[in-house]
Curated annotation (Swiss-Prot):
GO terms for biological process: methylation. GO terms for molecular function: protein arginine N5-methyltransferase activity. The gene is rmt2. S-adenosyl-L-methionine-dependent protein-arginine N-methyltransferase that methylates the delta-nitrogen atom of arginine residues to form N5-methylarginine (type IV) in target proteins. Monomethylates ribosomal protein L12. Belongs to the class I-like SAM-binding methyltransferase superfamily. RMT2 methyltransferase family. Residues 192-413 form the RMT2 domain. It is an enzyme of class 2 (transferase). GO terms for cellular component: cytoplasm; nucleus. It comes from Aspergillus oryzae (strain ATCC 42149 / RIB 40). This is Protein arginine N-methyltransferase 2.
Length: 413
């Protein structure tokens, strides 16, 4: 039988760490974290009631007071005091991250430390967590690359084991790799279905409805609420008629419809799902002006187009259930052989759109990787309507933030 005294001691250890974090007492935190012998991972302990980790506690303690106790609005001295609190909070956050705190750990309210900072209006602390997320994701992406190189030299069975270990980076819905690994009970219930992988999607039966395209697991492949985004993307890419354009991923055909309105000279469409291809043919896409349909995955089709010397003035990328690594390969290895020097390209920017901090992190990650590949990117902020009622009958709400950032990429000068 477990000694209840031991349980109390463990709880006291946890509460002592959380208290030191909320008091921004770095010397005490250092002593508690580095000398603790009873907790396996003291920098990431959790409060059983709130789910707060030390990062949450350090940030929540910076919540500003709007009024004095007597109800009088203040600014001067309290403003200085608040600044001092936030500076101490920032130093504590920095220390905890250096000690191995998980930047995107979830509390019982389904909030990461960055979510708490954003909700409380703590901009500098929020940006600090965004930067921590960027560093973590860049490192993970690089490590994924190293694992791929190692897999090439291993036996097939070992390679399969490695693949099993990295399946979590596959995209769910329209978003990029899931950035929040910890889950609440609600999230776990939502994610009990099969993993969303590109191979499973391509083998699945699809449901075509007026306002959505669903796979057999009720994942939203494309939805009508994206229409305004697609219209603006097409006009950004094709400001004049007579241009040559490539779209990777037809889906419901929303963006291709707007591309047609711009009267392109050539309109190439790559579509990998056989049921979508059949629907395209049923709707007569193959007979539309300038349209060429390429059936298959872009990984198989684009090298042939490059070999044929086919070039485009505009490219759009919107695939389903591919990883960020696939996307990076697309713009790092393929676009350069297909896009004219003065051409532009864009993509559906759904990376990390399940929460604002994830979206902000992946915007910065993408910017850095695009720069490494030789591209400049501009972003246009587009306000979105409330989408709460859009997800009825859909397994996972792949968009949970208030606005969309439309990317427009071109070669660096």
């Amino acid at each position: 039988m477990t000694d209840p005294t031991t349980e109390i001691d463990v709880d006291l250890d946890v509460q002592e760490i959380l208290l030191a974090a909320s008091q921004h007492d770095i010397p005490k935190l250092r002593q508690l974290i580095r000398s603790n012998q009873t907790i396996a991972n003291p920098v990431n302990v959790k409060d059983p009631e709130t789910g707060y980790a030390p990062l949450h506690a350090a940030i929540a303690a910076c919540e500003p007071d709007d009024e004095e106790p007597n109800g009088v609005q203040t600014n001067g001295e309290q403003g200085d005091e608040q600044k001092s609190v936030e500076e101490k909070g920032s130093a504590t956050v920095r220390f905890l991250l250096q000690e191995g705190a998980i930047w995107n750990d979830l509390d019982n309210n389904n909030e990461t430390p960055g979510c708490v900072a954003r909700r409380l209006g703590l901009t500098e602390l929020y940006e600090q967590l965004v930067d921590a997320g960027v560093r973590a994701e860049l490192l993970l992406n690089r490590l994924d690359g190293y694992e791929e190189l190692e897999d090439d030299d291993e036996e097939e069975e070992e390679g399969q084991e490695e693949q099993t270990g990295t399946e979590e980076v596959e995209v769910e819905g329209e978003s990029a790799p899931q950035l929040v690994e910890a889950t609440t009970t609600t999230e776990t219930a939502m994610e009990t279905g099969p993993d969303v992988t590109n191979s499973r999607y391509l083998d699945s039966n699809l449901t075509f409805q007026n306002d959505r395209l669903l796979d057999q697991d009720q994942n939203g492949v494309m939805m009508a609420w994206e229409t305004d985004i697609m219209a603006k993307s097409a006009k950004k890419l094709l400001p004049t008629s007579g241009l040559r354009v490539l779209n990777v991923g037809h889906g419901m055909g929303i963006v291709d419809g707007f591309i047609q309105e711009q009267s392109p000279a050539e309109h190439h469409i790559i579509e990998a799902h056989p049921e979508v291809v059949a629907e395209m043919k049923r709707k007569g896409w193959g007979e539309k002006p300038g349209v060429t349909i390429h059936e298959g995955r872009w990984q198989d089709i684009l090298p042939d187009l490059v070999g044929q010397g086919v070039m485009f003035d505009a490219i759009y990328y919107d695939t389903f259930a591919e990883s960020y690594g696939d996307f990076r390969e697309f713009f790092s290895e393929q676009v350069i052989g297909l896009l004219e020097q003065e051409g532009k390209w864009s993509f559906f920017n759904g990376m990390g759109a399940d929460r604002q901090i994830s979206y902000d992190v992946y915007q910065k990650v993408a910017e850095m990787d695009l720069m490494d590949a030789g591209f400049d990117v501009e972003w246009e902020e587009i306000a979105l309507p409330k989408l709460d009622n859009e997800w009825d009958g859909v397994r996972r709400a792949y968009w949970q933030i208030e606005s969309y950032r439309l990317p427009l990429c071109k070669y660096m000068d």
